[in-house]
Amino acid sequence: MNIELIVQLGSLTLITIAGPLIVALLFLRQGNL
């Protein structure tokens, strides 16, 4: 297994999961304010 490939896949999944999470957090914070 290529380490570079694993890193790329890991970062991709991280962005796909973290993206919506960050947006939701920001949305909730704005809603609370």
UniProtKB/Swiss-Prot annotation:
Record bears the keyword Ribosomal protein: no
Keywords: Chloroplast, Membrane, Photosynthesis, Photosystem II, Plastid, Thylakoid, Transmembrane, Transmembrane helix
This protein's GO CC annotations: chloroplast thylakoid membrane; photosystem II
GO biological process: photosynthesis
Record flagged with keyword Chloroplast: yes
Transmembrane segments: 5-25
Its membrane topology: Single-pass membrane protein
Location(s), subcellular: Plastid, Chloroplast thylakoid membrane
Major subcellular location class: plastid
Pfam families on file: PSII_Ycf12
Oligomer and partners: PSII is composed of 1 copy each of membrane proteins PsbA, PsbB, PsbC, PsbD, PsbE, PsbF, PsbH, PsbI, PsbJ, PsbK, PsbL, PsbM, PsbT, PsbY, PsbZ, Psb30/Ycf12, peripheral proteins of the oxygen-evolving complex and a large number of cofactors. It forms dimeric complexes.
Family indicated by similarity: Belongs to the Psb30/Ycf12 family.
Function: A core subunit of photosystem II (PSII), probably helps stabilize the reaction center.
Name of protein: Photosystem II reaction center protein Psb30
Source organism of the structure: Euglena mutabilis
Lineage of producing organism: Eukaryota, Discoba, Euglenozoa, Euglenida, Spirocuta
